[in-house]
């Protein structure tokens, strides 16, 4: 038993080291895209913080979802946040499964480049939308009479740039259309739908996305229109952007993605060694009439003809 555990642990460690080497090479080539995506996440948070300064509380708007779904109450608002946290952590961990699982379809660096591209495109549209029209927030801390509904003028620039994290992120107001939680949820679900392998988890992801939508409305964190707009906007953005982005390499084959630096080195090595001919041109030719086309002269010499 101990020998089996050691052997499996050794295999796992070799697989982990091999994956680390591959991912470091991909990171060296794609780090600027990841950095730009993370920077845009901060800019999105900065925009959401900025709209809170101009938010003005008022009567909650008439909403069909509020009539259909009973109000959960302020003490149960954590339920939707818990569901979202589970979705986020599950997807995050899944993107790192190639480091330990033998069967894999994705590269961690490349999948996050793709996911961040989807998120940034959706968040760009979201910022334009909630700055175009400021609606009175339906959340409890955004209603009239709440001290958090209006933000006082900032005392310094750092107060704005630091976003008053994490309190300023949790108790934001004014960034309504469309739901940021639904952007992340739908992007994650659609990504797993394409690159995941478990059919049950794919179905479960869509069920959780629907449940998350209902919980957001029942918690009065967003109007129904915020959730509805998120559903068709995110799906359309991902659909069209997915066709424009280069497809991920297929990991079902034994070939690794060729990094441009390695490709240049390989081509230079071939030229220096006089191996510029495609190796495919050197493969043995098929026999014709019982004679090898490459070795025709040799065979003739051997036979004395």
From Swiss-Prot:
Query: Hey, what tissues is this thing expressed in?
Result: Expressed at low levels in roots, leaves, stems, flowers and siliques.
- Broad class of the protein's primary localization: membrane
Report the EC number(s), separated by commas if there are several.
Answer: 2.7.8.-
Q: What class of enzyme is it?
A: transferase
Enumerate the GO terms in the molecular function aspect: inositol phosphoceramide synthase activity; phosphotransferase activity, for other substituted phosphate groups
Q: Does the keyword Acetylation apply?
A: no
Q: Any one cellular component term from GO for this entry?
A: membrane
UniProt GO BP = sphingolipid biosynthetic process
Q: What is the superkingdom listed in this entry's lineage?
A: Eukaryota
Membrane spanning residue stretches: 34-54, 81-101, 105-125, 169-189, 199-219, 222-242
Segments of this protein annotated with the region Disordered: 266-305
Residue spans of biased composition, Polar residues class = 290-305
Record's keyword terms, sorted: Lipid biosynthesis, Lipid metabolism, Membrane, Sphingolipid metabolism, Transferase, Transmembrane, Transmembrane helix
Q: Which residues form the active site?
A: 181, 222, 226
Instruction: Indicate how the chain sits in the lipid bilayer.
Output: Multi-pass membrane protein
Subcellular location, in the record's words?
Membrane
State its role: Catalyzes the transfer of the phosphorylinositol group from phosphatidylinositol (PI) to phytoceramide, an essential step in sphingolipid biosynthesis.
UniProt family annotation: Belongs to the sphingomyelin synthase family.
Q: What is this protein called?
A: Phosphatidylinositol:ceramide inositolphosphotransferase 1
Organism this protein belongs to: Arabidopsis thaliana
What gene name is listed for this protein?
IPCS1
């Amino acid at each position: 038993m101990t020998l089996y555990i050691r052997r499996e642990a050794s295999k796992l460690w070799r697989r982990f080291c091999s994956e680390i080497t591959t991912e470091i090479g991909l990171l060296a080539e794609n780090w600027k895209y990841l950095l730009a995506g993370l920077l845009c996440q901060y800019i999105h948070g900065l925009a959401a913080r900025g709209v809170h300064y101009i938010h003005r509380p008022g009567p909650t708007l008439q909403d069909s979802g509020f009539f259909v779904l009973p109000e959960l109450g302020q003490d149960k608002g954590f339920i939707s946040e818990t569901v979202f946290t589970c979705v986020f952590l599950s997807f995050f961990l899944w993107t790192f499964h190639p480091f330990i699982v033998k069967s894999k379809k994705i590269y961690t660096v490349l999948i996050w480049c793709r996911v961040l591209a989807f998120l940034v495109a959706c968040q760009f549209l979201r910022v334009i939308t909630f700055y175009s029209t400021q609606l009175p927030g339906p959340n409890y801390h955004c209603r009239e009479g709440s001290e958090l509904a209006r933000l006082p003028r900032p005392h310094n620039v750092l107060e704005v740039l630091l976003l008053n994290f994490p309190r300023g992120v949790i108790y934001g107001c004014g960034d309504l259309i469309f739901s940021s939680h639904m952007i992340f949820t739908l992007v994650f679900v659609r990504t797993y739908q394409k690159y995941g392998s478990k059919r049950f988890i794919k179905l479960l992801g869509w069920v959780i996305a629907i449940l998350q939508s209902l919980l957001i409305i029942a918690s009065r964190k967003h109007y129904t229109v915020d959730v509805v707009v998120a559903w068709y906007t995110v799906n359309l953005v991902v659909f069209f952007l997915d066709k424009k982005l280069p497809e991920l390499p297929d990991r079902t084959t034994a070939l690794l993605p060729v990094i441009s630096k390695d490709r240049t080195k390989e081509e230079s090595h071939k030229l220096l060694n006089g191996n510029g001919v495609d190796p495919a041109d050197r493969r043995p030719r098929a026999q014709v009439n019982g004679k090898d086309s490459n070795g025709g002269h040799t065979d003739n010499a051997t036979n004395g003809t």
